[in-house]
Each structure stands twice: as C-alpha cells, then as structure tokens.
Design a protein with these regions (language model features):
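Membrane-proximal helix-turn-helix segments that form the acceptor-binding/catalytic region
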Residues: 67-77, 99-106, 110, 136-175
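A short, active-site helix/loop in glycosyltransferases that binds the activated sugar's phosphate group
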Residues: 122, 152-194, 239
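Conserved donor-binding/catalytic core segment of Leloir-type glycosyltransferases
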Residues: 195-232, 238
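Acidic donor-binding loop of glycosyltransferase active sites
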Residues: 270-283, 296
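Short hydrophobic beta-strand element within catalytic cores of glycosyltransferases
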Residues: 297-304
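A charged, aromatic-enriched C-terminal amphipathic alpha-helix characteristic of glycosyltransferases
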Residues: 340-371
Length: 376
C-alpha cells in the first residue's frame, strides 16, 4: 500500500511509518515535527516565527507557510490511505483547514482520523464527569479550572475547532484511537467506525537496561513542558518528588528537564530508574512507553481500564497514582524505601511494551484495518 501520515504527536506517526515500511509498504510522513520537539519526517512543513513578537515576522511566516502547504499538497495525491493525526492536522486556523481536507479526500483513497490527543470528543468526555473518574478536566464530579482547560473548552466545544472535528469525524472512513481515554471519548458517537490500536514503540533490545539501584540511590526523571505543567499535573508530581527528596536525600536523585528536543530528552532519560509521566491519565503516554521499552519504571496512569482494553491480565508494571499530592508522595516514597521492587517492575515494563506496543505488531494491526476498508 501507499500510505500518507499527515501531522505528528509524540512521534506516533513516524514510529508507525517505520513499522509499515518494515512490512513492505510505501509511507510518507508530512509534519512539522510536533514543533520544538523535532520528530523525524519525510516532508517538513514548519511555520516559522509563529510566536514572534514582531507582527511583520508573524505575517511573513504565515504567508511562507501557506505557500509551502500549497506546494506540498500538490504532491499528496494517489495514496491508498491517508491518516490525519488530529482534526487540526496543519498549523492553520481551523476554518481554513477544510479545503485542504477536501483536497486530500478527493485525490486519495481511504481517509482515517487519529484520536491521539486533544480534540472535541476528549474535552467533552472529560467535562461530563461520568466517562472518567478523573481526567485533565475533572476529578470526580468536580471540574478542574485552569487557563489551559478554559482555552480548550472555548476552542473545541464553542469554536471552529469543534465544528471542524465534527465534519471530519462524520466524513472520514475510519477513526483510530491510540489510548483507552480516546477510545472511550469517541465510542458513544462513532462506534461503527472506531478502532482501538495501541501506540507503536520501537523495541530495541540493545538499549534495554534494568538500571538496578545498586548504591541505594533511586534516580528519578521528570520532563516538564512549562506551558502545560498544571494541565498535565507535572507541577503536583514534581512538588511531591521534591518532598520525598528532602526526606530521603541520600536515597533519591532527581533530574528535571524542560521542553527539550526528543533526541536530547531520550539521552537524559537513559540515566534514570524511574520516570514521572502524567497525573490525570488512565494510561501511560508515548514518552512513558518509550521509557518502559528501555527498562524504566513509570509513575503514571495504570488504571484497570487501560489493562483491560489491551487484554493484559498478568503484568502490572505501571506505578499507578491517583490525582492527588498525597497519592504521589506515598508511591514515590515506597519506591525509595523499597528499591528491591524495581527489578521486577522493570522486567514487566519491557515485557508489557513488547507484548502490546511493539511497532511491528502495531503496524500489522493498522495494515489489517486499512486493507479491510480498502476491500469494502
């Protein structure tokens, strides 16, 4: 098959492309590399000076980006399959994206929408306070209020992003959810065209290390995106970790990095035993899965639903925390006080990713889905 993957979140599309290529398919990834993260791609579409304080530069960047898009789009036809990372799959205002979507629809075969991140249905599910016990938007029946959430509610529920999401979700041939949360968000509305396929991870055995804390020092790693720290709960997790560090200074080492490119992030991550991921999730993120594949323990969401959707009844590698400061403190302190737990958790982490997220296994699931719809 000839496959186009358009847009990028957390290296999902590039990793999927590697798997599809290994299975013999022709794949093109077109993206901006998820902005500052700099993920690989075949064709780059980066919008320059988008946050510049100089209005002339911002305007020039917009014009150059649009010209680049028009040039690239002429080459994006004749594919058997097109998959979009999100309804907002290019860096334009949502009301300007639909003509590009229609062009792709007209000049290619089957079109799939990825449910891989923030969109209308994820926001809506978080706000109903019943789909999830907790999420980025709720804890029980209480809504979380912060600047990020207010912006997302405005844009996705009451603005043109939500309208674009509805139009694409209703028109596309299929929707693929990469995490339990996204599947649960779309299932009430699009069960007939929704498929769950886990995120793909390259399982490189040469990089797997058990990283046993032989000197009694447990090394923690925290990656911070400053603009999303409150939204993702990193602020609470880091505060809890600092408290544990202060209580056990001889047994705890903390590394904090902020908004670094992907390759640098991975290099720094490699030195740790434990990674702190997201506080309000049921499932580990792509970054957390990458860490687990290398033999690292992840503190994140490991709720029963996340294991059930992939059919995992044995392994429990994820240190599951509830969305509270006290829960995080307790779980982190237990790791420091009982480092003998780490080897088993590390081995289970590697096995978990190998069973469910290996990029070749995941790519094969995508191939089966694509071929099924192409035959209809």
């Amino acid at each position: 098959m000839k496959i186009l993957l358009l847009g990028e979140y957390s290296n999902v599309h590039w990793t999927l492309a590697e798997g599809l290529r290994a299975l013999g398919h022709e794949v093109c990834v077109v993206s901006d590399g998820d902005r500052w993260k700099g993920y690989p791609r075949d064709i780059s579409i980066v919008r320059r000076w988008r946050t510049s304080a100089n209005p002339f530069k911002r305007g020039l960047g917009a014009v150059l980006y649009l010209l680049r898009l028009l040039w690239v789009m002429r080459r994006l036809k004749g594919y058997d399959v097109v998959q979009l990372i999100n309804p907002v799959f290019i860096d334009l205002k949502p009301q300007r994206i639909m003509p590009f979507y229609r062009y792709l629809r007209r000049h290619n075969g089957k079109l799939f929408l990825g449910a891989f991140g923030i969109d209308k249905y994820w926001v809506k599910a978080g706000l109903d306070c019943t789909t999830f016990r907790y999420s980025d938007f709720n804890i029980g029946s209480e809504l979380r209020h912060n600047t990020d959430n207010d912006i997302m509610i405005r844009d996705w529920l009451h603005g043109p992003k939500g309208e674009l999401n509805d139009r694409i979700a209703n028109d596309c041939d299929g929707i693929v959810a990469g995490l339990y949360e996204y599947y649960a968000s779309y299932n009430p509305y699009f069960a007939d065209k929704l498929t769950f396929i886990p995120f793909p991870i390259v399982v490189d055995e040469s990089r797997q290390k058990l990283r046993i804390a032989t000197d009694g020092v447990v090394k923690f790693f925290v990656g911070v995106q400053r603009e999303r720290s409150v939204y993702k709960g990193t602020d609470i997790m880091l505060s809890a970790l600092r408290r544990v560090e202060a209580a056990h200074p001889d047994n705890c080492q903390v590394t904090v990095v902020e908004s670094v490119p992907f390759q640098q992030y991975i290099q720094l991550l490699n030195q740790a035993h434990v990674q702190l991921d997201q506080l309000y999730s049921y499932t580990p993120s792509m970054n957390a899965l990458q860490a687990m594949a290398q033999g690292m323990v992840v503190v994140s969401g490991g709720e029963p639903e996340s294991y059930a959707i992939i059919g995992e009844q044995e392994l429990r590698p994820i240190v599951n925390v509830q969305p509270s400061y006290d829960s995080v403190c307790h779980e982190l302190e237990q790791l420091v006080l009982h480092p003998e737990r780490l080897p088993l958790l590390k081995r289970q982490s590697i096995e978990y990713v190998s069973r469910h997220h290996d990029y070749l296994k995941v790519a094969a699931q995508y191939v089966a889905l694509y071929e099924k719809l192409l035959c209809q």
